[in-house]
Amino acid sequence: APLLGKEALVAVRTKILPCAHVVTPNIMEAEILSERSIRSMEDVKDAALRIHELGPTAVLIKGGHLTGQDAIDVLYDGQSFTELKSVRLDSQNTHGTGCTLSAAIAASLAKGHTLVSACHLAKSYVTEAIRNGFSIGQGYGALHHLWASGTFPDSIKPLS
């Protein structure tokens, strides 16, 4: 079942997106927002154009759900496209990647980085958080947000 009903989706398109600086939909979300299917990089770029027309300053479509040896995200800033590539990691420890990416972009922008630089930094950070992620509970495992510190707090260590 879709997370948002039709009325809520209309509100996202007409009220929220026009106020957004950067939106970061995954492939499935981008298909809904752009009202088109996405199967290729050209489709991703067309979807980014369509979403951009709804009002956000920039659109970063996350390519983690596409196939291929690389995970390629596409940033469109209203003028040009930038592809952000990383090696596709074979990991189930991906819970929270979208929220973490958005937060890392916002933090990098707040620190004064350009949009392109902020997106590159955020993608690198999330890639390493996935690479260093851990299985906890059932289902998708967690990212290791503190990977750069080299520490793993006892409070979040798996019990097994």
Q: Can you say where each PLM-predicted feature lies in the sequence?
A:
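Short, small-residue alpha-helix embedded
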Residues: I32, S91-L115
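Regular secondary-structure segments
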Residues: Y76, S102, A106-A110, K123, ...
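Glycine-rich beta-alpha junction loops
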Residues: G64-L66, V87-D90, K123-V126
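Gly/Ser/Thr-rich beta-alpha loop segments that engage phosphate groups in nucleotides
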Residues: H65-L66, G98-T100, A104, G141-L143
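Short pre-catalytic strand/loop immediately N-terminal to key active-site residues, enriched for Gly-Thr
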Residues: F81-H95
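Phosphate-handling active-site elements
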Residues: F81-T82, S108-A122
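Charged C-terminal helix
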Residues: V116-S160
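Conserved phosphate/ATP/ADP-binding segment of small-molecule kinases
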Residues: P2-F81
